[in-house]
């Protein structure tokens, strides 16, 4: 099995609330299926739906879906680098739209500062699984794929 990482560059920055109770979020496509991405990979919809369902049940719904600032080299979340918590993940066509709250951790404060200064931050997903080369020239993600985190910044 290989570490599989995908990057998506367009996320929207949202502020909810006002004053000291204001919370900063990023929202946008966190995952994509049924299209060949920039890394030359394609995730079948059935695999992505299964993994998003599992990830949502085990992590998002329990407040445990954390992500890091920076793109780690492994599939585990390093708590000292946590910057955000994924609060929603839902399917829209071939995209899975995520929403993540920027946390008040040291890395979250860096992410918040960068976003408020207009830096365009993208997200990347991480998982492990096998890849199969296709005759069309792309690699298809295998049935053994397991989503580790839906979005790191």
Residue map of PLM features:
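Short, solvent-exposed secondary-structure boundary motifs
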Residues: 1-5, 69-82
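A generic alpha-helix propensity feature with a strong bias for hydrophobic helices
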Residues: 47, 75-78, 150
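Residue microenvironments linked to proteolytic maturation
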Residues: 10, 14, 18-28, 66-68, ...
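Short conserved beta-strand and strand-loop elements enriched in small hydrophobics
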Residues: 54, 60-77, 123
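Polar/acidic, low-complexity leader/linker segments enriched in S/T/G and N/D
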Residues: 1-62
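Compositionally biased, intrinsically disordered low-complexity segments enriched
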Residues: 34, 57-60, 73, 93, ...
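Short, surface-exposed beta-strand/loop "edge" segments at domain boundaries and coil↔beta transitions
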Residues: 32-41, 73-78, 106-109
């Amino acid at each position: 099995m290989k570490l599989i990482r995908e990057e998506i560059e367009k996320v929207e920055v949202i502020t909810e609330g006002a004053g000291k109770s204001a919370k900063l979020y990023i929202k946008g496509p966190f995952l994509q299926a049924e299209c060949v991405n920039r890394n030359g990979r394609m995730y079948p919809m059935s695999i992505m739906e299964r993994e998003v369902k599992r990830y949502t049940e085990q992590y998002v719904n329990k407040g445990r879906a954390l992500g890091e600032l920076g793109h780690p080299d492994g599939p585990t979340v390093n708590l000292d680098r946590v910057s955000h918590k994924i609060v929603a993940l839902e399917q829209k066509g071939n995209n899975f739209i995520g929403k993540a709250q920027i946390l008040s951790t040291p890395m979250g404060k860096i992410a918040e500062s960068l976003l408020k200064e207009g830096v365009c931050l993208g997200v990347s997903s991480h998982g492990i699984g096998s890849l199969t080369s296709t005759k069309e020239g792309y690699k298809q993600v295998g049935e053994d794929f397991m989503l580790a985190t839906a979005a790191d910044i």
